[in-house]
């Protein structure tokens, strides 16, 4: 334990918190252009073809982003909005594309949890 005198001379160092989403640069979302749209397989206990895309962000970062929901309209040169949020069974995928923003369309025929997939309220 440090004495009061020692703490007066040299205060305690603040702990630096490392960001889980460095490419966002402390912003809630970032815009980017798809450089590659492809599918990849998840880690060991799971099996699927997960839809992901490589995105070149406006700040120069190139990141891998997950495309949630059933079906998508993204291709190379599509402009997308990226938010934070990793995909646990895809190593290196730390971002999600925002559905229903910019060039990324919302999910078709989605009735529940619509706000997460960029779907307007259906005409009852």
Swiss-Prot record:
The gene is rpsL. With S4 and S5 plays an important role in translational accuracy. The keyword Ligase does not apply. This is Small ribosomal subunit protein uS12. InterPro entries: NA-bd_OB-fold (IPR012340), Ribosomal_uS12 (IPR006032), Ribosomal_uS12_bac (IPR005679). The keyword Metal-binding does not apply. Part of the 30S ribosomal subunit. Contacts proteins S8 and S17. May interact with IF1 in the 30S initiation complex. It comes from the Bacteria. PROSITE patterns: RIBOSOMAL_S12. Keywords: Methylation, Ribonucleoprotein, Ribosomal protein, RNA-binding, rRNA-binding, tRNA-binding. CDD domains: Ribosomal_S12. Gene3D superfamilies: Nucleic acid-binding proteins (2.40.50.140). GO terms for cellular component: ribosome; small ribosomal subunit. One of its GO terms (biological process) is translation. Belongs to the universal ribosomal protein uS12 family. The modification 3-methylthioaspartic acid is found at residue 89. Pfam families: Ribosom_S12_S23. One of its GO terms (molecular function) is rRNA binding.
């Amino acid at each position: 334990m440090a004495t009061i005198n020692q703490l007066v001379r040299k205060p305690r160092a603040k702990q630096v918190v490392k960001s889980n989403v460095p490419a966002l640069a402390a912003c809630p979302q970032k815009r980017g252009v798809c450089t590659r749209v492809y599918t990849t397989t998840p880690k060991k206990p799971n099996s699927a073809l997960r839809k992901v895309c490589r995105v070149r962000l406006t700040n120069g970062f190139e990141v891998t982003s997950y495309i949630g929901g059933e079906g998508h309209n993204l291709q190379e040169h599509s402009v997308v909005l990226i938010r934070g949020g990793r995909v646990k069974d895809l190593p290196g995928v730390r971002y999600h594309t925002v559905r229903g923003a910019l060039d990324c369309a919302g999910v078709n025929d989605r009735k529940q949890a619509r706000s997460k997939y960029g779907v307007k309220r259906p005409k009852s």
